[in-house]
Regions:
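Periplasmic-binding protein-like
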Residues: 38-42
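PLP-dependent aminotransferase-like
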Residues: 1-27, 84
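Well-formed, non-transmembrane alpha-helical positions, independent of function
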Residues: 29-30, 161
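ALDH superfamily catalytic-core signature
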Residues: 11, 44-170
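Acidic-histidine catalytic/liganding microenvironments
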Residues: 33
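Beta-loop-alpha module in the N-terminal Rossmann-like domain of NAD(P)-dependent dehydrogenases
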Residues: 22-29, 43-50
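Short beta-strand(s) of the beta-wing in winged-helix/HTH DNA-binding folds
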Residues: 17, 37, 168-170
Length: 170
């Protein structure tokens, strides 16, 4: 991969290992290999549980960061801050969703105190409207397509669940 080409010669052999493939083939092979000294995994709880079982069977130390993404919470005192701070708070919320959920610390939702909902979300939506969607090969594109139809369908199902539970999709 490009990353390996860029930094491969800067690191001692074995420090950077890029393994491509799906979890069942690539991940499970790593989690059961006697050549692996330690496993660090970030991802879903079911997959993390499976990796920990595989690692335990082979007595491989492991560290996991699993699911349970937390909300970003905004209280009314934020609106008493300088405009630049409010803008950065709105930008932070947008950037949290910008990575498409691929970071364990990204928020899964925002909780905004009702008294500031309208003005704060107006600021957030200004930021959202600046996002250029399109072909991921276009250097001006900020958000491209989902990795697969399966991932796209999963996202739509979460939106549907949220709406059924009373969430508003903006």
């Amino acid at each position: 991969t490009l990353l390996a080409e860029l930094v491969g010669d800067l690191l001692p052999p074995g420090v950077l290992n890029i393994v491509q493939g799906f979890g069942r083939e690539a991940g499970e092979a790593l989690a059961t290999s006697k050549r692996i000294a330690k496993i660090a995994f970030t991802g879903s709880t079911p997959v993390g549980s499976h990796i920990m079982r595989c690692a335990a069977e082979n007595i491989i130390p492991s560290t996991v960061e699993l699911g349970g993404k937390s909300p970003n919470i905004y209280f009314e005192d934020i609106m008493q801050a300088e405009p630049a701070f409010i803008e950065k708070a709105a930008e932070g919320l947008v950037l949290g969703f910008f990575n498409q959920g691929e970071v364990c610390t990204c928020p899964s939702r925002a909780l905004v105190q009702e008294s500031i909902y309208e003005p704060f979300m107006a600021e957030v939506m200004k930021k959202v409207k600046q996002i250029k969607r399109g072909n991921p090969l276009d250097t001006d594109t900020m958000v491209g397509a989902q990795a697969s139809q399966q991932q796209f369908d999963k996202i739509l199902s979460y939106l549907e669940i949220g709406q059924q539970e009373g969430a508003q999709v903006l």
